[in-house]
Amino acid sequence: MILNFNTSFTLKKKFILSIYPILYLFIFISCNQEEKATISPNIIWLVAEDQSPEFLPMYGDLSAKLPHLSNLAKDGVVYTNAYSPVPVCAPARSAIISGLYPTSLGTHNMRTYNAYNKKNQPAMGIPSYSPIFQSGIKMFPRYLREKGYYTTNNSKEDYNFKKTEGVWDESSKKAHWKNRKPNQPFFSVFNFGITHESQIWRQTNQPLLVKPEMLTVPPIFPDTPEVRKDLAVNYSNLIRLDSQIGKVIEQLKSEGLYENSIIFFYGDHGGPFPRYKRALYETGIKVPLIVKFEGKKIADSINDDFISFIDFAPSVLSLANIKPPTIMQGKAQFGSYKSDKESEFIFASSDRFDEQVDRLRSVRFGKFKYIRNFNPKISNAIPVSYREQMPMMKHLNKLWENNQLDDNVSAWFKTPKPIEELYNLENDPYELKNLSNENDLQDTLVFLRERLDRWIIETNDLGEFPEKELIDKWFPKGKPPKLAPLNKIISGNKISLSHPDTGVSIVWKQVKDSIWSVYSKPLDYSESIQAKGVRIGYEDTSLLIFPHK
């Protein structure tokens, strides 16, 4: 067939003209989808100290009305199996900020780096120290800053190690997203101390906002006026917490930021009471977690997946469309890099608490929970001096001394502890009936025993070593090793910086500024700039100042 050139051209022209709108629409949609995929959402963390889910209405306890948190739950997802890997704050916070188990980091003891007291535990010969982390382990907000996020922390920095520069744009009691550039995405953390353990005795003379006689007393406590009073103080503190959280949520709404922001509400470990905080029982490690996604996606729903604090860092990076570093032990539970596999196990640890030393490990699989006590001669009710200030703790001690506690309560005080504990959490949520000697559960016992052994090896559990031995290994000269100087190359009016240790982060700032930025490209040599290298556990490099005067 011979085609007339003009006819062929006309047909081609008609085809192109007819398909152009379709191509344009396809390109337009594709670009919008690509743009949507790379949008950096605002992410806000609202953190309650020392609270278990069992005290909150979205988990079934209606003792205290918490309207702001209840509304957040309606707009988001309530997670019923969220866990801290350690039942106390500083080690737990080290897991949150790094994406790794405290037992792998060396932050498993409470405390290691003590910003409140440099002497730390002088009677034990334990100074304040910042463990040396494996190369490549960094505080995850720095990755957000590299992508252009404005990061704020209000205001607790009790990470159990000395933080490095370059992580936060602001970290203070005044830190807030409002100081960012116009339309700059932000990650903001707000810590609320009103529900902390210490507030049980510090708020004891404040008006109660619930009636003690209307409360349900957990079966691990005696039903006495003293116990009911402290329970009522906690519920009252939760009401005060709800009011404080409501103010942050109202700010987001008034600025038009609420709908399309991702909001986490969680507790940093279990409740403030004895056998809650510092205990490897569910009361000590299970935490409340609500996540409101952009546009209220999956709103008013419940999720039973296992989530650990080691998953928080990779999950936030994934939500920000940043690939989590492979060195993180946690997995992304949400976002662009969400893991294809659900978590099957929850692991947790317990070691030194202030001046008291013990060692326990636990693993949960399905409905079963296994706990190993490495020091059975030590009571679970170790006399931590900080906790001894609580009226309830004083009351329990007196009842124990007078042999006035029932079996459910006295088990926490008794020695020796069983070397192994096994519980069916569906039938026994407070872990009162140890099933480790049940014949029909021996296969389950052996399975969890071996799985815990494997986890200890796989994650290089540093709790295997005495704390002083770790300190001597990290600091043979009695102080943190100093990093080698930065390398610099000057080309024209630009200076490029590097460091032989790939685990070192380089930070810089103009001399007049107070905030350090993460180095990512050559700097202008004509400006007055300071730069240094930082790595967790090490003394910073010598300060590089240029141009030289």
Region annotations inferred by a language model:
Residues 1-13:
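N-terminal secretory signal peptides that target proteins for export/translocation
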Residues 3-5, 18, 31-414, 418, ...:
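Formylglycine-dependent sulfatase
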Residues 3-4, 436, 443-450, 457-549:
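Short, compositionally stereotyped local motifs that mark structural "simplifiers"
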Residues 18-28:
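Bacterial N-terminal signal peptides
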Residues 292-294, 425, 547-549:
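Short beta-strand-to-coil "C-cap" segments at the C-terminal boundary of structured domains/repeats
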Residues 316, 422-424, 428, 448, ...:
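Hydrophobic, well-ordered secondary-structure elements that form the walls
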Residues 340, 354, 455-463:
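Short secondary-structure junctions and interdomain/linker hinges
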Residues 418-421, 504:
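A short pocket-lining beta-strand/turn micro-motif at the edge of beta-sheets
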